């Protein structure tokens, strides 16, 4: 499968949501599109998790800069 960037994946996910909200689809088609959306959601979530791990916050302490890990909720997984 071709690797696509986060923005492209998010756009595809938005298109899936639009189809489910607006189009009149059969139950089978709705389920297929929903499953596609779940896969896209997972790709976006995984990419965001990777990026979050790379983020550092630089804070100033006593005229020195210090890198600390990006704070995040451990409960969200």
From Swiss-Prot:
Annotated compartments: Cytoplasm
Alphabetized InterPro entries for the sequence: Exonuc_VII_S, Exonuc_VII_ssu_sf
**SUPFAM superfamilies recorded:** XseB-like
GO CC terms for this protein?
A: cytosol; exodeoxyribonuclease VII complex
What reaction(s) does this enzyme catalyze? Exonucleolytic cleavage in either 5'- to 3'- or 3'- to 5'-direction to yield nucleoside 5'-phosphates
State the Pfam families in the record: Exonuc_VII_S
- What one GO molecular function would you report for this record? exodeoxyribonuclease VII activity
Keyword annotations for this protein, in alphabetical order, are: Cytoplasm, Exonuclease, Hydrolase, Nuclease
EC number from the UniProt entry:
3.1.11.6
Q: Does the keyword Cytoplasm apply?
A: yes
Reply yes or no: does the keyword Acyltransferase apply: no
Q: Which GO terms describe its biological process?
A: DNA catabolic process
- Please explain the role this protein plays, according to its UniProt record: Bidirectionally degrades single-stranded DNA into large acid-insoluble oligonucleotides, which are then degraded further into small acid-soluble oligonucleotides.
**Assembly notes:** Heterooligomer composed of large and small subunits.
Q: Which NCBIfam families match?
A: PRK00977.1-4, xseB
Its family remark reads: Belongs to the XseB family.
Protein name as it appears in the record: Exodeoxyribonuclease 7 small subunit
What species was this sequence derived from?
Alkaliphilus oremlandii (strain OhILAs)
High-level lineage: Bacteria, Bacillati, Bacillota, Clostridia, Peptostreptococcales
In the UniProt record, the gene name given for this protein reads xseB
């Amino acid at each position: 499968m071709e690797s696509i960037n986060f923005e492209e994946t998010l756009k595809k996910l938005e298109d899936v949501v639009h189809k489910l909200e607006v189009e009149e689809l059969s139950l089978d088609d709705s389920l297929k599109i929903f499953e596609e959306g779940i896969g896209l959601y997972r790709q976006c979530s995984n990419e965001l998790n990777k990026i979050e791990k790379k983020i550092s916050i630089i804070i100033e302490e006593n005229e020195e800069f210090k890198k600390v890990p990006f704070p995040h909720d451990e409960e969200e997984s």
